[in-house]
Amino acid sequence: MAKRKIVKKKVVRKSIAKGIVYISATFNNTMVTVTDEMGNAIAWSSAGGLGFKGSKKSTPYAAQQAVEDALNKAKEHGIKEVGIKVQGPGSGRETAVKSVGGVEGIKVTFFKDITPLPHNGCRPPKRRRV
């Protein structure tokens, strides 16, 4: 019996110039996704995925590291211009937005807050009593 040759397909990376950075800042974590203009995910990162555990995930420093990690992955695909869309009330929100502008070689084109606001929808959780 003849042996089959194993042929690996080469990974073809498309060069994408423009993209959108989605920053989801919750009270417990910060998630960052870089997409192209059509919404296809190119790179992503989160504070928990970088090794931050417990209450350290919700810190501004962890959010900054998550943004830098996601954008460095996206730069391999050729991203040069990004828009920023922020969602959520988390503590890492402001730092994450500032660190997008701090990454070398990436220009910020727009900024938009897409946090959903209820028009008197669900009842919020009761206050913590410690």
From Swiss-Prot:
GO cellular component terms, A-Z: ribonucleoprotein complex; ribosome
Cross-referenced InterPro entries: Ribosomal_uS11, Ribosomal_uS11_bac-type, Ribosomal_uS11_CS, Ribosomal_uS11_sf
SUPFAM superfamilies for the chain: Translational machinery components
Keyword Ribonucleoprotein: yes
GO annotation terms (biological process): translation
Residue ranges that the Swiss-Prot or TrEMBL entry lists as coiled coil: none
PANTHER family listed in its UniProt record: 40S RIBOSOMAL PROTEIN S14/30S RIBOSOMAL PROTEIN S11 (PTHR11759)
NCBIfam families in alphabetical order: PRK05309.1 (NF003698), uS11_bact (TIGR03632)
Function: Located on the platform of the 30S subunit, it bridges several disparate RNA helices of the 16S rRNA. Forms part of the Shine-Dalgarno cleft in the 70S ribosome.
Assembly and binders: Part of the 30S ribosomal subunit. Interacts with proteins S7 and S18. Binds to IF-3.
Protein family per UniProt: Belongs to the universal ribosomal protein uS11 family.
Protein's name according to its UniProt entry: Small ribosomal subunit protein uS11
